[in-house]
From Swiss-Prot:
Function: Involved in base excision repair of DNA damaged by oxidation or by mutagenic agents. Acts as a DNA glycosylase that recognizes and removes damaged bases. Has a preference for oxidized purines, such as 7,8-dihydro-8-oxoguanine (8-oxoG). Has AP (apurinic/apyrimidinic) lyase activity and introduces nicks in the DNA strand. Cleaves the DNA backbone by beta-delta elimination to generate a single-strand break at the site of the removed base with both 3'- and 5'-phosphates.
Residues binding DNA: H104, R126, K169
Cofactor note: Binds 1 zinc ion per subunit.
Key words, A-Z: DNA damage, DNA repair, DNA-binding, Glycosidase, Hydrolase, Lyase, Metal-binding, Multifunctional enzyme, Zinc, Zinc-finger
Name this protein carries in UniProt: Formamidopyrimidine-DNA glycosylase
Domain of life of the native organism: Bacteria
Listed SMART domains: Fapy_DNA_glyco, H2TH
Reactions that this protein is recorded to catalyse: Hydrolysis of DNA containing ring-opened 7-methylguanine residues, releasing 2,6-diamino-4-hydroxy-5-(N-methyl)formamidopyrimidine; 2'-deoxyribonucleotide-(2'-deoxyribose 5'-phosphate)-2'-deoxyribonucleotide-DNA = a 3'-end 2'-deoxyribonucleotide-(2,3-dehydro-2,3-deoxyribose 5'-phosphate)-DNA + a 5'-end 5'-phospho-2'-deoxyribonucleoside-DNA + H(+)
Upper lineage: Bacteria, Pseudomonadati, Pseudomonadota, Alphaproteobacteria, Hyphomicrobiales
Similarity comment: Belongs to the FPG family.
Length: 296
C-alpha cells in the first residue's frame, strides 16, 4: 500500500497538470470501488473548476469551485494517469502489477486545461481504493479526517506532542506509531526505518519514552528527528518502488535502495559498529524488520 511519501509524490506530479483546469465531465465505469460512489457523484463534480490538489495523511483532496472536495484514496493498487491528445503521460502513477489493463480504468475525469483537453484516468485492478465527496468548510470533522494525528512533515510533530500521545501506553512502540490517530500517514516501511535510525526496539513499550512528569525522554527526541528525516528523505527520493510506486514522470522512486532494515531480514546490520543481524517479526499482522542487537 502506498504510504505518505508515495502519495505526496502523486500529489506533486498531478497538481501542475490539473490545478486550474475545468472538470468538464466525470465518467464512472462502475457503480463502486471499495465503496459505492456518492449518489450523483458524476453530476456533482462535472462542470466545476479544479482549484487545488492537496494531501492529508494518505488521502488526496481535489478542491472544486463551490466548496466541494473530491477525496481519493489509492488503496492497494490505484493509479492516476493523464492522457493528453495522442501522448500519454503518467503523473503520480501507482501500479499493481506493473503496467495497466484498460479494463481496470474505473473513473475518467475529462478536463479542459491551459494546454488543452486531457483525461485523468483512475485505474485500480484490486479496487481497494475509493472516492468520496466532502465539503471544504467541514472537512476537518469528516469521518476520514477528524481523528487523524499530526503530519510527520510539519512543525506540529514534535517531542512534546508525541509524549502526550504515548504517555502511559504499554503497547509496542511500533504499533503505537502506526496508529493514524498518533501520526497521520506514517506507515509500516517508514516506521521500521525510523526506529532503526533512532536505535529503538519496535517491541519496546511506547510509554517508556515518556518520564513520570509526561515529558519526552532523550530517546523520544531522537525518534521524532528520525521520523521527520526518513519521511523527508523518502519524498526527496520519489518514494519507494517495491511493486506499487512509480514517479510522476514514469520513473521509479529509489528510496528502497536506502532501506537500512526494511525487507533486509538475514542481512548484517548497517549501523557502524553493530555486528547484529536484521530480523523479521510479525506485529499486529504486519512484518517488522529490526536489529535486535542495536535497537533497544
Amino acid at each position: 500500500m502506498p504510504e505518505l511519501p508515495e502519495v505526496e509524490t502523486v500529489k506533486r506530479g498531478l497538481a501542475p497538470a490539473i490545478e486550474g483546469a475545468l472538470l468538464v465531465r466525470a465518467e464512472l465505469r462502475r457503480p463502486d470501488l471499495r465503496f459505492p460512489f456518492p449518489e450523483n457523484f458524476a453530476a456533482a463534480v462535472s462542470g466545476r473548476r479544479i482549484l487545488a490538489l492537496s494531501r492529508r495523511a494518505k488521502y488526496l483532496m481535489i478542491d472544486l469551485e463551490g466548496g466541494d472536495v473530491i477525496v481519493a484514496h489509492l488503496g492497494m493498487s490505484g493509479s492516476f494517469r493523464i492522457e493528453a491528445g495522442a501522448q500519454p503521460a503518467a503523473p503520480g502513477e501507482f501500479h499493481h502489477p506493473r503496467g495497466k489493463d484498460e479494463k481496470h480504468d474505473h473513473v475518467i475525469f475529462h478536463l479542459d486545461g491551459g494546454s488543452g483537453q486531457m483525461r485523468v484516468i483512475y485505474n485500480d485492478p484490486r479496487r481497494f481504493g475509493f472516492m468520496d465527496l466532502a465539503r471544504r468548510d467541514t472537512i476537518a470533522e469528516h469521518a476520514y479526517f477528524r481523528d487523524l494525528g499530526e503530519e510527520p512533515t510539519g512543525n506540529a510533530l514534535d517531542a512534546a506532542y508525541l509524549a502526550a500521545r504515548l504517555a502511559g501506553k504499554s503497547q509496542p512502540l511500533k504499533t503505537a506509531l502506526l496508529d493514524q490517530r498518533t501520526i497521520a500517514g506514517l506507515g509500516n516501511i517508514y516506521v521500521c526505518e525510523a526506529l532503526w535510525r533512532s536505535g529503538l526496539s519496535p517491541n519496546r513499550a511506547a510509554g517508556t519514552l515518556v518520564d513520570k512528569r509526561g515529558r519526552p525522554k532523550q530517546a523520544l527526541l531522537a525518534l521524532v528527528e528520525a521520523i521527520r528525516a526518513v519521511i523527508a528523505d523518502a519524498i526527496a527520493a520519489g518514494g519507494s518502488s517495491l511493486k506499487d510506486h512509480i514517479q510522476a514522470d514514469g520513473s521509479l522512486g529509489y528510496f528502497q535502495h536506502a532501506f537500512s532494515v526494511y525487507d533486509r531480514a538475514g542481512e548484517a546490520c548497517r549501523k557502524p559498529g553493530c555486528d547484529g543481524t536484521v530480523t523479521r517479526i510479525v506485529q499486529a499482522g504486519r512484518s517488522t524488520f529490526h536489529c535486535p542487537r542495536c535497537q533497544k
